[in-house]
Amino acid sequence: MAKSPANNAAQRVRKKVRKNISDGIAHVHASFNNTIITITDRQGNALSWASSGGQGFKGSRKSTPFAAQVASEVAGRAAIEQGIKNLDVEIKGPGPGRESSVRALGALGIRITSISDVTPVPHNGCRPQKRRRI
């Protein structure tokens, strides 16, 4: 007799393994439309991530500093569960969620050891987008 599919699905679910990693890197990608926070270990393996859109903000509310703050809190709490205590923050992009995401991580009790801006700056590469006219 074949096993029921519900039973098989329940057996395949794996429990999250708690990694005891004390140091990590918070990658904050702040675009004009969204803010994505990924917290990794020193080797670059992702421990947790969150985005403004993933927290229920849609449309123009995704690109607010408050949405970035909420996303940082969600990613930070998940990283604390993994054992993170110290973070280096790497910020990429010109978006409005740059500063508020760093403040939110610090408010969670995570010690921020360094903040660096890794926004890619072209040496006159691709042509930029046309100016917006309203």
UniProtKB/Swiss-Prot annotation:
GO cellular component: ribonucleoprotein complex; ribosome
Keyword Translocase appears in the UniProt entry: no
PANTHER family with a match to the protein in the record: 40S RIBOSOMAL PROTEIN S14/30S RIBOSOMAL PROTEIN S11
Record keywords: Ribonucleoprotein, Ribosomal protein, RNA-binding, rRNA-binding
One Pfam family matching this protein: Ribosomal_S11
NCBIfam families noted in UniProt: PRK05309.1, uS11_bact
InterPro entries tied to this protein: Ribosomal_uS11, Ribosomal_uS11_bac-type, Ribosomal_uS11_CS, Ribosomal_uS11_sf
BP terms from Gene Ontology: translation
UniProt subunit comment: Part of the 30S ribosomal subunit. Interacts with proteins S7 and S18. Binds to IF-3.
Stated family: Belongs to the universal ribosomal protein uS11 family.
PROSITE patterns for the chain: RIBOSOMAL_S11
MF terms in GO: rRNA binding; structural constituent of ribosome
Protein name: Small ribosomal subunit protein uS11
Purpose of the protein: Located on the platform of the 30S subunit, it bridges several disparate RNA helices of the 16S rRNA. Forms part of the Shine-Dalgarno cleft in the 70S ribosome.
